[in-house]
């Protein structure tokens, strides 16, 4: 994995990442013209997981890097008890939280979703935290961009799925790791 930025301290990383989420032009776009597109896209993804018995109604779900919360709303509409975190909170939907230090008890969630792997400064810590908060029989879906030019807020670039990502899962069984059609959020690979 290639790291794209160097910081003298962790606060510099957080400040850099917050710039994207706090950008008023981006936020307005996420909350208006992209809201329905992303909400419908997430509902499709999660509906497929329900149909395939990966998810069940009333399960507890956590969305990491949820920004303005479309994935949370989608999961709630499908009957899950969903919450989300981001380094910048959003109204009642998204709580302030750090993907590298999840403030939840061990085995708290049946499902964890994230599509911000590329924004992780410490991917091994992010995956370790996901595994810690997942229940033993829980599922995690991570979607990301592979071999697609990143923006200035990406912290890492995946060079090898097996080495850079799959090897980080120490307590999990990989159900699939596969290419997907580039979706509404620009993601083209997913791991379940």
Regions found by a protein language model. Give the residues of each.
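Class I SAM-dependent methyltransferase Rossmann-like catalytic core
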Residues: 1-53
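Class I SAM-dependent methyltransferase SAM/SAH-binding core
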Residues: 60-101
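A short acidic, Gly/Pro-enriched loop at the edge of an enzyme's catalytic core
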Residues: 100-112
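A short SAM/SAH-binding and catalytic strip from SAM-dependent methyltransferases
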Residues: 110-123
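A short glycine-rich, Lys/Arg-flanked "PGG" loop and its adjoining helix->strand segment in the class I
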Residues: 124-139
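Conserved class I S-adenosyl-L-methionine
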Residues: 141-170
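Core SAM-dependent methyltransferase catalytic element
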Residues: 172-192
């Amino acid at each position: 994995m290639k790291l794209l930025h160097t910081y003298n301290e962790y606060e510099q990383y957080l400040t850099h990442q917050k710039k994207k989420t706090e950008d008023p032009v981006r936020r307005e776009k996420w909350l208006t013209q992209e809201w329905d597109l992303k909400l419908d896209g997430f509902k499709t993804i999660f509906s497929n997981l329900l149909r395939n018995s990966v998810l069940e109604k009333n399960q507890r779900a956590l969305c990491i890097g949820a920004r303005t919360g479309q994935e949370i709303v989608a999961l709630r509409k499908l009957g899950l008890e969903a919450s989300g975190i981001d380094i910048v909170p959003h109204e009642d939907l998204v709580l302030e939280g750090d993907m590298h230090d999840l403030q939840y008890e061990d085995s708290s969630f049946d499902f964890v979703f994230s599509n911000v792997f590329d924004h992780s400064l410490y991917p091994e810590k992010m995956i370790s935290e996901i595994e810690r908060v997942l229940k033993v029989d829980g599922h995690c879906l991570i979607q990301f961009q592979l071999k697609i030019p990143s923006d200035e807020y990406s912290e890492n670039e995946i060079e090898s799925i097996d080495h850079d990502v799959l090897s980080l899962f120490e307590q999990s069984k990989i159900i699939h790791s596969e290419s997907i059609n580039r979706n509404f959020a620009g993601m083209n690979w997913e791991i379940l």
